[in-house]
């Protein structure tokens, strides 16, 4: 799905699938949806991506209930700049951001994970937590990788206390144990 697609038919299919997701979310009582930004380096010119994404979201958001938030997630984004520009220009409380900390630490990103937080903080609604070694999107447990996870979580708690978090691991037990060992969770 690509809100910034060059082809109008792809944008139409994207809007249709998002409508279906909204409908399912309403039925399930879900009020926060995470959507990939759609940016692919070397495919989209950054200016085009931003311009087309802003136009798409301005047209689509009136269909989103006032109590629902769509959060754009970084996947192949090189920096937080394009996503923050889109949300700032759209200027609608129903559109926010999702920081995928692991994606910010892959070969696609030119910006270290800690440097994604401050620019995204005013718009950050959700966070995906997993670790890796700085190259591939391994979805390793929080304590296994090169991301300074304790520092990341401390800054997230300070700058984005209302954001929700998802642990994105095949097996969450090691990450839950790490969170408890670091004092983020009680060991019940």
At which residue positions do the language-model features occur?
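Histidine-acidic metal/acid-base catalytic patches
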Residues: 20-26, 31, 80-188
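Active-site acidic/histidine proton-transfer and metal-coordination neighborhood
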Residues: 3-96
């Amino acid at each position: 799905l690509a809100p910034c697609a060059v082809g109008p038919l792809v944008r139409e299919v994207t809007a249709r699938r998002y409508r279906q997701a909204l409908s399912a979310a309403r039925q399930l009582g879900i009020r926060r949806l995470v959507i990939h930004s759609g940016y692919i380096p070397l495919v989209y010119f950054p200016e085009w991506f931003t311009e087309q994404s802003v136009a798409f979201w301005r047209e689509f958001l009136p269909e989103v209930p006032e109590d629902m938030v769509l959060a754009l997630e970084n996947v192949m984004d090189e920096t937080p700049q394009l996503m923050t520009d889109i949300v700032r220009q759209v200027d609608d409380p129903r559109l926010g951001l999702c920081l995928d900390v692991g994606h910010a630490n892959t070969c696609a990103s030119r910006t270290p994970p800690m440097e994604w937080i401050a620019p995204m903080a005013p718009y950050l609604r959700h966070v995906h937590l997993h670790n890796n070694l700085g190259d591939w999107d391994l979805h390793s447990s929080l304590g296994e990788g090169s991301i300074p996870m304790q520092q990341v979580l401390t800054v997230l708690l300070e700058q984005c206390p209302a954001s929700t978090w998802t642990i994105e691991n095949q097996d969450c037990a090691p990450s839950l144990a790490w969170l408890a060992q670091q004092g983020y969770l009680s060991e019940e």
